[in-house]
């Protein structure tokens, strides 16, 4: 089976792409990585948690059920985020990874419930949280309830922080909308993948509202790093070692 690179549009053997961390061997483009593959890249072991919430359609949005079922089939996941507990470099941690193939990781009530529950579990068990974001923002099919997830998850992250515990975020392409306006930017350390798009509204919308002409790359990870919005850009194949080092330092601090 072959897949098409999002940048060079060349057909690539899917197995080869997976082995190369979804990085195109022809042009170097970082293609969007499913949550399960990212977990395989990062962890030695991982136990899924908070995976039992049922589908809800709170405002009876037309065709939402059909789109939801299609997203489940396409992604192989039950929702737009996978949460659980695992080890990275032998360090025990809680992890959430958003799923790009499930409605582009959009935030609905189940996504908010899962991430909130993970933070609460991590706070109770005094564990750090590693979060990978990829999101188009709030899920419009759930109306105002999707926007409420921003405050709910942010409050849980704040309680985790108040307990003196570590939260590291890796923003991946794209991290936009309500995710950027809440938990994606609350990490003690915020890293990103090369070339990731990070922002709230799209470039065209911002230009229309402000009346200004903006640089083409103003929402790129490189622009954000240059202007102090994130802390580091880490190549995908180096992230496991990078996070393991941070977790090891934090473990020494907590136990001291």
UniProtKB/Swiss-Prot annotation:
It is an enzyme of class 2 (transferase). One of its GO terms (cellular component) is acetyl-CoA carboxylase complex. Its EC number is 2.1.3.15. Pathway: Lipid metabolism; malonyl-CoA biosynthesis; malonyl-CoA from acetyl-CoA: step 1/1. Binds 1 zinc ion per subunit. Coiled coil: none annotated. It catalyses: N(6)-carboxybiotinyl-L-lysyl-[protein] + acetyl-CoA = N(6)-biotinyl-L-lysyl-[protein] + malonyl-CoA. Acetyl-CoA carboxylase is a heterohexamer composed of biotin carboxyl carrier protein (AccB), biotin carboxylase (AccC) and two subunits each of ACCase subunit alpha (AccA) and ACCase subunit beta (AccD). This is Acetyl-coenzyme A carboxylase carboxyl transferase subunit beta 2. It comes from Lachnospira eligens (strain ATCC 27750 / DSM 3376 / VPI C15-48 / C15-B4) (Eubacterium eligens).
């Amino acid at each position: 089976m072959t897949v098409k690179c999002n940048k060079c549009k060349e057909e690539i053997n899917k197995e080869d792409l997976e082995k190369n961390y979804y990085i195109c061997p022809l042009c170097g483009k970082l293609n969007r990585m499913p949550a399960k593959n990212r977990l395989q890249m990062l962890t030695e072991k991982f136990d899924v948690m908070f995976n039992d919430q049922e589908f809800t359609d709170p405002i009876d949005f037309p065709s939402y059920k059909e789109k939801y079922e299609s997203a489940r089939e396409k992604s192989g996941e039950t929702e737009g985020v996978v949460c659980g507990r695992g080890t990275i470099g032998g360090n025990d941690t809680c992890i959430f990874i958003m799923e790009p193939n499930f409605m582009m990781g959009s935030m609905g009530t189940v996504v908010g419930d899962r991430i909130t529950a993970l933070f609460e579990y991590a706070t109770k068990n005094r564990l750090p949280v590693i979060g990978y974001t990829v999101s188009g923002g709030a899920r419009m099919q759930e109306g105002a309830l999707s926007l409420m997830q921003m405050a709910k998850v942010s409050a849980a992250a704040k309680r985790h922080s108040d307990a003196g515990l570590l939260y590291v975020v890796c923003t991946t392409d794209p991290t936009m909308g309500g995710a950027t306006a809440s938990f994606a930017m609350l990490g003690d350390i915020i890293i990103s993948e090369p070339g990731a798009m990070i922002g709230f509204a799209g470039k065209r919308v911002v230009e229309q509202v402000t009346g200004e002409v903006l640089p083409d790359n103003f929402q790129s990870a490189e622009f954000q790093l240059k202007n102090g919005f994130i802390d580091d850009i880490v190549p995908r194949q180096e992230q496991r070692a990078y996070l393991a080092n941070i977790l090891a330092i934090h473990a020494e601090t907590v136990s001291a």
